[in-house]
Amino acid sequence: DSHVTIMQASASTLSENIEIARFAEHVGVDLIMPSYPLGFYPQHPDEVIGYTSELASATSLGMIVFAMNLWNFTRLHPSGFAPAWLEELVDTVPNIVAIKNEIGDPGVAGLADVFRRFTGRVMVSDPLEMNSPAWTQTFGMGWMGTSNYEYFGAKVPEYFALLQEPGGYDRAMEIYWQLHPARSASGMLMKESNAGTSFVHRLLWKYQGWLQGFNGGALRSPHLRLHDRQMQLLRRAALDSGLALAPGEDAEFFVGRVRA
């Protein structure tokens, strides 16, 4: 009961994503979070709002609106996902329950505006864990996701829980700084892989989880190639952060712990 399952609707068309969402509802998934297809090129904000609303209305699942600046919507609004669009969606679509808030890079003013507008109306999360101490202090952010926190073992949930407690901030920051070598390495590699691609390096994320005992193994294409220097940097940074690593040589990652 303490776990919430989220299905990311990232297929190639709206109709495919509606089909996936209905299947997810049938098998008991809790929430849906849409991506926007690579071929989706809206000419007006109403198309973004309409796509999101139609997918949300196709099931009774709660929806997390994935508001970020990498959907190629900046021609429609400089933030990449206008707060006014979110206002209309929250006001008119009753099963929108949360916002994954990544608009307006560079800087945090756009993020803060979304927190200011919507905290108390829906759940608002900045998924970048390095920002969580600021948002819990200023806006009471009580949920964070989704991202590659498994690289840090159980430490991110541990310090995030402390941030919610009166008097827990100092202890939370001790853990926060412990993780900084791993955080810095991960951030550097993600910036490197994202540059010019708008593509999250999911195989790298999967390797990060594998270091903590997750399965590893292949991903379906398309995805970016994972290089030795990247694996070596992530392994070393995790050890520098005092994280215990699961056994296994890097070659074993590509096979996976459980073979089909």
What is each residue range found by the language model?
Residues D1-A21, T119-V124, A185, S198-Y207:
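Helix-coil boundary/capping segments in enzymes
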Residues S2, G28, V93, F139-G140, ...:
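Glycine-centered loop/turn motif at secondary-structure junctions
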Residues E54-N194:
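Catalytic alpha/beta core domains of metabolic enzymes, predominantly
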Residues Y151-A260:
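C-terminal alpha-helical cap/extension of soluble enzyme domains
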